[in-house]
Amino acid sequence: MKSVCGVLIILVVLTTMLSISTFSTVGAEGDCPISEAIKCVEKCKEKVEVCEPGVCKCSG
């Protein structure tokens, strides 16, 4: 059971790091809450164009 919790924690950390690195390379303007950022990454994969509170636009 401990290994399952460890895997879940690792997945959350990796997802958060991925979303942060994705938005720093995209150059997102404005404040994008981490919860919104994760939703945008899930929706657009790596093609996020705009991430603002309540606004998520995919490029392409």
From Swiss-Prot:
Record keywords, A-Z: Disulfide bond, Ion channel impairing toxin, Neurotoxin, Potassium channel impairing toxin, Secreted, Signal, Toxin, Voltage-gated potassium channel impairing toxin
Entry annotated with the keyword Disulfide bond: yes
Signal peptide interval: 1-28
Record GO terms (molecular function): potassium channel regulator activity; toxin activity
Cellular component, GO, one term: extracellular region
Keyword Cytoplasm: no
Protein name from the UniProt record: Potassium channel toxin alpha-KTx 29.1
Source organism per UniProt: Lychas mucronatus
